[in-house]
Swiss-Prot record:
Source species: Candida albicans (strain WO-1) (Yeast)
Protein's recorded name: Enolase-phosphatase E1
Chain positions recorded as Mg(2+) binding sites: 18, 20, 221
Gene (UniProt): UTR4
Cofactor(s), names only, from the UniProt record: Mg(2+)
Entry's localization field: Cytoplasm; Nucleus
């Protein structure tokens, strides 16, 4: 039997959501987005002449302008550029040039429906319903290590779901845009690293909640992020989803997850 997660003391009117492992399968980025980027990269690189140092970047060619930021020894051939980016992806290195190029290629994939974000149905329903659940104008924000541009793309192209009853199965082919339901976005460039309490204090300041941090709930699958949010004064729960890795001890080596509220679906929230 599922136990509804109740909040205490000050009512919660603001929820901040992590993405991977919280509202979206943790495998989506590594099993879908990263391979899509690597698959499309050769055809993108084949559009240009090499070495790129001899090629003029036009103001409207975003890809070429990004590639021109690479050192000359990398841009001497399409093969060397491909090898460079693949190495960064394989090692999960958060390189700004890589992220810029990934963002452009993913944007094309989302726009032609080759990519759709598999947001959990309970998360879709929560995002659609929570803002209008009371007259106090409840708010939802996103905080992810992925860029804000990538966050907006993801929530703007949410995969439709299949609804099954005892007698019928309804399949919708529409792509859902959840961005109108969201009040803002934060990433590591605008708020800071997610395992540091100062990042959450900065968010509280940005959303005018510094004086009432207990009215803000942060949801994440990462215990260190949850601890950092709590240290900043927020309420925070651990979210466990299928496929998520086991919850490790925190950065101090403490197995303190037993002291945290844990939910397995946003349906369990009683806000």
């Amino acid at each position: 039997m599922t136990t509804t997660a109740k909040t205490d003391d000050i009512p919660i009117d603001t929820v901040i959501l992590d993405i991977e492992g919280t509202v979206c399968p943790i495998t989506f980025v590594k099993d879908t987005l990263f391979p899509y980027f690597i698959e499309k990269l050769p055809s993108i690189l084949d559009k240009f002449q090499y070495p790129l140092s001899n090629t003029s970047a036009s103001s409207d060619d975003q890809v070429l302008n990004i590639l021109k930021q690479l050192p000359d020894n990398i841009t001497k051939s399409s093969e060397s550029i491909y090898k460079h980016f693949k190495n960064l992806v394989d090692q999960d290195i958060k390189d700004p040039i890589l992220k810029s190029l990934q963002g452009l290629i993913w944007k094309q994939g989302y726009e032609n429906n080759e990519l759709q974000a598999p947001i959990y149905q309970d998360s879709v329903e929560f995002i659609e319903s929570f803002p209008t659940k009371s007259s106090t104008n409840n708010k939802i924000y996103i905080y992810s290590s992925g860029s804000i541009k990538a966050q907006i793309l993801l929530f703007g192209h949410v995969k439709s779901t299949t609804t099954t009853t005892t007698t019928t199965t309804t399949i919708t082919n529409e792509v859902i845009d959840l961005n109108p339901k969201l009040n803002g976005y934060f990433d590591i460039t605008t708020a800071g690293f997610k395992n540091q309490s100062n990042s959450y204090k900065k968010i509280l300041q940005e959303i005018n909640k510094s004086s009432t941090p207990k009215s803000v709930l942060f949801l994440s699958d990462n215990i260190n992020e949850v601890n950092a949010a709590i240290e900043a004064g927020m309420k925070s729960y651990i979210v466990i989803r299928p496929g998520n890795p086991p919850i490790d001890d925190d950065d101090d080596g403490n197995d303190d997850k037993i002291n945290h509220k844990i939910i397995y679906s946003l349906d369990e929230l009683d806000l």
